[in-house]
Amino acid sequence: MKNKSNIFYSRIVSYVAVAVLLIAISGWIKIPLPIPITFQFATIALLCFLLGEYCTVAVSVYIVMGLIGLPVFAEGGGFSYVLNPTFGYLLGFLVGSFVCGKICTFGDVSTRLKPKRMITAVGIFFVFVYLTGTVYGICIFNFYVEANADFWYLMTVFVFNTLWKDVILCFVIIPLAKKLVPLIGLKK
């Protein structure tokens, strides 16, 4: 029994390492706007389906790597990145991946792949990421940068610029997750 447990945890460590790499790569592929559009949202949402709550470990490792100075974030790295308005999205990824991962791994594989559950999981992930990212970004703009920008301008910068892309990608990752979870998803 102990050998089977060791194999399971070895797989988790391997999957988490690959997940950190995928998160970093998806952050580097970006469309340059005031808030760069990356593919991290879709990548992390897909990883939630595949890894469950272990996706939170991958996101945590990614954030720690960036904060200690490795240039893994979309705009570099280092501890000063916490003053970047986009850092709130990374915090949202952390909390959202935990909640979404728990939803995605509750029950057996056939229950996890029901469309209603998958849409709910991605929707909750969406809310956590955008709520945390937007509130954090507005706070940084108003209290650190002292920009005193208009509310609707900030909503355009933090929400409306990227919202459409993430909604479209949600419709892509759900069918992709339905195919990949039975193949490589963690089974408890």
Predicted regions mapped to residue ranges:
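Residue-level signature of transmembrane alpha-helical entry/exit and packing/kink sites
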Residues: 8-19, 37-44, 55, 85, ...
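Membrane-water interface at transmembrane helix exits
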Residues: 26-31, 65, 100, 104-108, ...
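Hydrophobic alpha-helical transmembrane segments
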Residues: 30-42, 63-71, 104-119, 180
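Short helix-perturbing small/polar motifs within transmembrane alpha-helices
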Residues: 2-3, 11-12, 18, 25, ...
